[in-house]
Amino acid sequence: MRLVIAQCTVDYVGRLTAHLPSARRLLLFKADGSVSVHADDRAYKPLNWMSPPCWIVEPTDGDATVWVVENKAGEQLRITVEAIEHDSSHELGVDPGLVKDGVEAHLQALLAEHVELLGAGYTLVRREYMTPIGPVDLLCRDEQGRSVAVEIKRRGEIDGVEQLTRYLELLNRDSLLAPVAGVFAAQQIKPQARTLATDRGIRCLTLDYDKMRGMDNDEFRLF
């Protein structure tokens, strides 16, 4: 990961345009290929960002350095760096990933057992299907035999959609699996996350944890 603190302006050029005037900001260049621009507020949320894969060019023109970050759709972040206060790179290695809380782990187990909740004809291929950047919660096949990656959360937020998007990009490079569709499943899905998922062709599924636990309860089983 590369960390840069700089006085800079930022322009986004793509389907829309956006401009951030000159200010001191933190620029994050991550090993996964993402770039994000942060201010000293907004918690973890960036002012602007570019999701992977994207490419960075750092030419020097005149008095200011213009860093151009471009994704495969041709959208650009143009970062005009006026002064750099800090520039360092760090090798963080492979992260073990977030350990799911009890509810998320139970949701995963229940959905794996009752995979028909995803749709008629769905079958489970594997839980915790490993990718180079971490495990997909469930890998399934739909009624037509097509691969489906399922990410399960207790609260469905934008970060979860981004995580599933990265998994899908990698899985779709595997000719034995592609094409791979995505399902974002959670007890509660925030409107912004649902909008982003829909825009990316990812289906959203709201899970009723209490009902699913009832399905798992011996009291409700005939045998």
From Swiss-Prot:
It comes from the Bacteria. GO terms for cellular component: cytoplasm. It is found in: Cytoplasm. One of its GO terms (molecular function) is DNA binding. The keyword Iron does not apply. Gene3D superfamilies: 2.70.180.20, 3.40.1350.10. Its EC number is 3.1.-.-. Keywords: Cytoplasm, DNA-binding, Endonuclease, Hydrolase, Nuclease. Its main location: cytoplasm. CDD domains: NucS-like (cd22341). It holds the Pfam family NucS_N. Signal peptide: none annotated. Belongs to the NucS endonuclease family. PANTHER family: ENDONUCLEASE NUCS (PTHR38814:SF1). Cleaves both 3' and 5' ssDNA extremities of branched DNA structures. HAMAP family: NucS. This is Endonuclease NucS. It comes from Mycolicibacterium vanbaalenii (strain DSM 7251 / JCM 13017 / BCRC 16820 / KCTC 9966 / NRRL B-24157 / PYR-1). The gene is nucS.
